[in-house]
From Swiss-Prot:
Plays a role in mitochondrial morphogenesis. Belongs to the TMEM11 family. The keyword Protein transport does not apply. Signal peptide: none annotated. It comes from Gallus gallus. This is Transmembrane protein 11, mitochondrial. InterPro entries: TMEM11 (IPR026120). Keywords: Membrane, Mitochondrion, Mitochondrion inner membrane, Transmembrane, Transmembrane helix. Pfam families: Mito_morph_reg. Residues 1-23 are annotated as: Disordered. It is found in: Mitochondrion inner membrane.
Amino acid sequence: MAAWGRRRAGPGSTNSGGGGRERVTLSSTDCYIVHEIYNGENAQDQFEYELEQALEAQYKYIVIEPTRIGDETARWITVGNCLHKTAVLAGTTCLFTPLALPVDYSHYISLPAGVLSMACCTLYGISWQFDPCCKYQVEYDAYKLSRLPLHTLTSSTPVVLVRKDDLHRKRLHNTIALAALVYCVKKIYELYAV
């Protein structure tokens, strides 16, 4: 875990604001940098290998200098986030539409939304769930980025990944998609069995 934090200013401190920020060094297990160093024809393969090793080693921060691999990784994470959010929002729409619309019309919105939620959840489960990249998010916060040793990089636009626990996120979209599935099966049974 990163060794950064806020410390209160003591009585002998010159900071009159009551709280100052101090920089503390990161340990070597917190941050890994995939440097953009071209050594031969297989440089891209080497970058991909280094990134894969860093993801599997579960570093807290991963800085990706090579633009192509950084952009691909950021897009992959963005697509996974989109699938997650779509599964949650569509499932929520499926479950709450019957409460907001008349019974005769609610299934025209809730059933497609439920199917969309289940499809996104299934696709996420197949393509992203076991990928080590799904444990990371792209960091955009300037303050958090200022804590990292980015001054040593040769690239002006590195992609910075931060490891985050996604257990609650997966539970949320799986629970909502499962509830949407139950609702859809029940509603289809009611529509066609009666």
